[in-house]
Design a protein with these regions (language model features):
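Low-complexity, intrinsically disordered extramembrane tails and loops of integral membrane proteins
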Residues: 1-32
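Hydrophobic membrane-insertion alpha-helices, especially the h-region
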Residues: 35-49
Length: 285
């Protein structure tokens, strides 16, 4: 259950002279109508060129928006940590439910974003409960990658995943395991526990395909890197089709780009939070 301590979370017109009376002499001048016609032609030219301009700028604009989404998540996570002294766990803790039926880390983070929920949530019922049908039909724009063009199973389907570390079992590992990352099903990391360095530790990145729902716990929203190639490989983590870089959010709140061909040792070092790995200078990523 989401803790109760979390924040839920003109001047009147001048009647002495009407606009039509004031400007009537000007309206009679030929220069006005010539200028008006020229402006109309210019407007038509601009509007006709707009679709082409949009198509040309589209990919760059979508990439910028995806980075903005990650920055907003980073800010929300920092604010959450500032409030509770730790980051949210990978799933909302309901021990009676399998992790796949629990709500994801996104639910407790929502009060710290500018898109509050308009429906009530009962975490112990699980995200797939019929009482949450309206919620699952809700979209939260910052969790949708604008670069993603594939069809979504639900309106709440998301495109970002929290990183649990290295290995298929990473999300279930204990806190002190060297393969652990920031997120785990029941792990709550602190800034102090990220001893590899905040700027060297990966928190959230993009999925190749949309998940079932951003509210779904388990592998839908928390994954470890388990099979090489780590990016655009079997784990489903990486760049969406048609893009050339993977956007990542680091624990210091910064957003960086990685090549899908990034070296496996770099990915492993970024994915863990306290393994003592040496991370190459960011200029080498």
């Amino acid at each position: 259950m989401v803790p109760d301590t979390e924040p839920n979370i003109f001047r009147a017109p001048d009647l002495k002279e009407s606009p039509s009376e004031k400007f009537r002499p000007f309206l009679r001048r030929p220069v006005f109508w010539v200028s008006f016609a020229a402006a109309g032609v210019l407007l038509i030219l601009v509007l006709s060129a707009f679709p082409l301009m949009t198509r040309q700028a589209g990919p760059a604009a979508r990439r910028v928006q995806s980075k903005s989404n990650l920055r907003q998540m980073g800010l929300a996570l920092q604010n959450y940590h500032g409030t509770f002294g730790m980051f949210p766990a990978g799933t909302v803790s309901v021990p009676e439910l399998p992790v796949e039926q629990r709500f994801s880390w996104i639910l407790p983070l929502i009060p710290f974003t500018d898109q509050p929920l308009r429906t009530e949530v009962r975490a112990e019922a699980g995200w797939q409960s019929a009482e949450h049908a309206e919620l699952i039909d809700t979209s939260q724009i910052i969790y949708r990658n604008p670069e993603q063009r594939l069809e979504r199973p639900f309106r709440s389907a998301g495109d970002y995943v929290a990183i649990a570390g290295i290995g298929a079992d990473a999300a279930a590992l204990p806190e002190n395991h060297p393969r652990t990352g920031v997120f785990g099903h029941d792990r709550r990391s602190t800034l102090e526990s990220i001893t590899d360095g905040l700027s060297n530790t990966l928190m959230i990145t993009t999925l190749v395909q949309p998940n079932r729902s951003m509210f779904a716990g388990g592998r839908e929203t928390v994954r470890g890197f388990s099979q090489q190639p780590y990016l655009n490989g079997p784990d489903g983590i990486g760049a969406v089709a048609g893009t050339k870089a993977v956007q990542i959010l680091l624990a210091d709140g910064s957003v960086r780009s990685l090549s899908p061909a990034a070296d496996a040792t770099l990915i492993e070092a970024l994915a863990t939070k306290a393994a003592g790995d040496r991370v190459a200078d960011q200029s080498e990523w």
